Amino acid sequence: MTLEETTDQYRNRAYQWLSENLTLLEEELNEDDGGVAVYLNVDLETERRLLNETVVWHQKKLAAGFAAIDWPLEYGGQGLPSSYTQIFQEEEAKFVTPDVHEAFIVTTGMVAPTIRDFGSELLREKALKGILDGSDTCVQLLSEPDAGSDLASV
């Protein structure tokens, strides 16, 4: 994005890029169309294929400047306001995209922002580049006493 680019121009550029790389949805989904599973129960081969498809799509967006949109420049982002991320997501929702693997959602949606916002500079330097380029995937372990996943007592 250039400094002169308005949100409408950004939206148009995003839509143009998406239309060159994806197929437009034939109809919009309604909330009544059923749920969307976050955690899939698939075999290892399918799991690897799905994660690879997610990473490839993410890398394509990253190369075009449509990933880490609201991340600071010093961490590999575009340095734009979060409203630009929202704009891109709204436009992307109009297209058929690869399914996003849950490990990638945890990595980019939970772990990366936590490291970016609260991690030491050393941790940021070590972790964020691999997360951003899709070469590193993270997991999040939770400890919930009396809820079946009390890792603290193990």
Predicted regions and their residues:
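Conserved beta/loop motifs at nucleotide-recognition and modification sites
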Residues: 24
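Intrinsic disorder at enzyme termini
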Residues: 1-11
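Mature N-terminal segment immediately following signal peptide/propeptide cleavage
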Residues: 16
